[in-house]
Amino acid sequence: MTQYRFMAGVTIKIFAAFHVFNEAVASSQPCAGWSMYPTLDATGDAVLLLPMAYWRPKIWGMSNKRPERGDLVVTTNMNNPAYTVCKRVIGIEGDVVEIEPTRSVDGSKSWAQGRFLRVPKGHIWIVGDNLSNSTDSRDYGPVPIAMVKGKVTHRIWHRGWLDWTTLGPNMSYLGPSPVPPPGSVQPRPL
């Protein structure tokens, strides 16, 4: 009987260690949909998620690290908290972001004036790389940093094959970023 108790204890400890590793150190995360195309495939890629990428214990002499512009992050879905979304950070606290662009992403069309917003403290502004087919901060506003599940560093599964593509801060898919001249527009809340 003690042998079964010992084996049950070891099994529980192994599952607990795996769970802690999966929740705090590294895990795979499926990402499907057109929002992050062409960076991630619409049929579904798996990415490496690092939950501890933005956390450092104070004993190391470092404060909590914040998401930076260009980072790919997984956050809780603002429209349905039971799900997560994978998006790119384009604005951090204090940045002024354009909500309604004054020109198309490829720069071919322009409009009179865009809407701008200053990202509040403790928040980030996230968008999908496929701007024309993404529900993101343009729809639900700034995302609290507390809702960030972790940083995406690599694609590990692509079209049915193992893959190890590094996903860095490449924002070239987002097109040109118009910056308003100083004093021309005042940021206003949503």
Region roles according to the model:
Residues S137-M147:
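Segments surrounding the PLD/"HKD" phosphodiesterase catalytic module and close analogs
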Residues A82-I99:
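Mid-length scaffold segments of soluble, non-membrane domains
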Residues V89, F116, K151-V152:
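A structural signal for short, hydrophobic beta-strand segments that form beta-sheets
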Residues I92-D95, R118-H123, P144-I145:
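A short, structured loop/turn motif at beta-sheet edges
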Residues E100-S110:
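PP2C/PPM family metal-dependent serine/threonine protein phosphatase catalytic domain
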Residues M1-T84, S104, A146-M147, K151-L190:
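Protein maturation boundaries and topogenic segments
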